[in-house]
Every structure is written in C-alpha cells, then in structure tokens.
Amino acid sequence: MVIPPPIPSGVPKSSRWKIPLIVIGVIVGLLIVFGIQIAFWSFSAREFELSTSQKESVITIDYASEFFLIDKDVGIEEWDCQRFIDGSIQIYYLYVDESTSLDCTISVERNRGDSLASYIAEWQTLKLRNEFSEVKVEIEATDKVFSWGDDSKFAFQLSDDTRNGFAFIARKDNKIFFVDAWGLLLEDPEEISEFLTPKLEIFAAESYLD
C-alpha cells in the first residue's frame, strides 16, 4: 500500500480554507461597519427653519453693516441649520467677499459635557485653520477685552503683525456662540461690547431645542 506524503507541519489541511474565509469575513465586516457609519452620518442630521428670534441671535452681515462700512451686495451669504439625531443643533452663517469674511456659529448640545467639548474643539479648529491657511493668521488672545457667559475667549487676528479681525467664543449652559470676523475690526472694549452683547443676550434667552 502506498502511504500518502505527510502534510507539512504548521499548515494543517483543515486550515487551508479557514485563512481565506477569515480574511473575507474581516473585509465584509469592515465594509458593513463603514456602510453603517455612512448611513448614520447621512441620516442623523436634518435641516430646520429658524424662528425669528433664533435668526436674530446670529451676527449677520446686515447687522455688521450697522457698525462697519460694508458693500454687502458684492459678497455671498450662506446659511446651514442642522438638527442631529441626539437632538443637538448647529446654526451656521457665513458671509464672504474679496476682503471680508464673517462666520457665526451657534451650537446647542444636550448636556454640559458635550458643550464643553464643542467649546474647546471650535476654538482649536480656528487656530488650526489660521495656522495652515494660505495667508498665515496669528491669534492674539486677550480675554480682558471682552468676556461673557460661563466660559469665553476673545482674540484679535493678525496678518503680518497687523490686526485685521477678531474671534470670540462663549459658552452659556449647553450653548456655544462663536464668531470669526476677518476684515472687520473693533479694538475698543466698549465698541466690542456694543457689537456682541445685543446678540449674546438674544442667544442667552433662546432655548433653541423647544
């Protein structure tokens, strides 16, 4: 009787099909997870219409034109209002022209922990965006100029050591108010307060989540 050759050690005969099946299973699993993530982000946010008071809480180019000489007709405005699956919301406003940009974002979270995380992330994003922009923008933090709410940060924004804008962020309870202005400059603390405070008071009184 002819004895069959021995199976090489370390590669059991029954495992020859297991390895490809495991690899295929891992790939399929990753694709499923990836698909679930895509579906989650695609369906977790819904646009919503702002109420009059909610819209009034946002710093827009129309409001800024009461303080600055702006030819607002030459720029582009953008609104994006999203309500997420956990009930949190984000209101995003942007105006841009050749020399001016104005970004005002309001975020409302479901709890204090999330609001603190959003508060920190928003400011860090500003710093990173300025660091890697085509024209490097420096942040001159000076919280003594203006403060508000439970937490806040104020900074002038500089290019070539010259102030040409400012940024401000504040947290009140579970709400975050952020404004990033370029080509719009106020340096006097009283003028800055006159510009920001009316909108912040509306922001503080508005619940947004009702």
Annotate each predicted stretch with a short phrase:
Residues 13-23:
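N-terminal export and membrane-targeting signals
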